[in-house]
Amino acid sequence: MISYELQTFIIAATPIIELRGAIPIALFNYELSVTSAFIFSVLGNIFPVIFILLFFEKVSNFLSQKSKLFKRFFDWLFTRTRKKHQGNYERFRDLFLVIFVSIPLPITGAWTGSLCAFLFGIPFKRAFPLISLGVIIAGVIVTLISLGMILI
């Protein structure tokens, strides 16, 4: 049997659910302490970020080298994305990334934040701490909502 802590970690590592689902499950289904629920959810949510940030670029480069179709697609995607959002995003990109990851709604979070960092060319050394900070803030928000300390 897998421990509840490891189950919480795994749930938090999954896309879409992330810690937004892991914390309430850990608190109410597994009856973990607030501290355990928070720590295992945050760590589980941050864990895949490392691989996403490190390997998306390698995969896109590999595919671009192997296929003209992929090269055209990635060139189009990066050029379009960066040109379309360059003005406002460049000035506030660090703040944007933290806020985007910290908003506890579906389609925002560590997975999507990592994808955004990749698309905008934010290097790992900069993106990882920003996304981690956003995950910690999201963890605090979701924990407080789960405990009824913030009403939604």
Regions inferred by a protein language model and the residue ranges of each:
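Membrane-embedded alpha-helical core segments of multi-pass
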Residues: 108, 138-141
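Helix-capping/transition residues at the boundaries of transmembrane alpha-helices
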Residues: 27, 117-119, 150
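Membrane-interfacial helix-loop-helix
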Residues: 1-8, 29-38, 43-101, 125-126, ...
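Transmembrane helix boundary and interhelical junction motifs in multipass membrane proteins
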Residues: 13-25, 104-115
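Interfacial loop-to-transmembrane junctions
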Residues: 117-137
